[in-house]
């Protein structure tokens, strides 16, 4: 995957993240100096933060210095995060929330940049591919079978909902199963408002892909009054056709 990423993407990431850390920390004099990038063929992404003697303008917060080498890493001088003493459960929850924040940010941003129709097309396909690729590993991590009928896939969806801090339930028959997923936190707006239909459509691609890996003879659809996710989602797993 790295071979397909242009170096401009790395620069954009550094500009949007590392260059803004000084401002986020309340220190407008702090900038980032990038010395190496893997997308340019270097052996690592390397750089260091430099505190200047004056506040930096936005275009000064990131500088590239490919003729320099970053300082050697000294573990003894590195700060120790408070999470080093956290119990495993708290650490796992923090990692989960951190990962979920990426998706909560990315989906609305895709709509803002691409527009709803193109975002649903581009991101929906990407989500489907992620579901296809990682379904087996997810089942293994959850201790669930990766094959079976509608009931088995519904059980997977419920486990994923609970892993995200939500509650979900199953109803129906062996052939047609409905998963009630009240108010997915991952999709809600920052103010708790229900997600836009386009965001639900992109997110659904993840489960369409997972279902394709589980059983190509089954389909997933949204049904009932919960179609707009105001009261949560109702996901139906049933035979195709």
What is each model feature region?
Residues 17-22, 207-208:
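Short amphipathic alpha-helical segments
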Residues 2-13, 27-44, 50-241:
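N-terminal accessory segment detector
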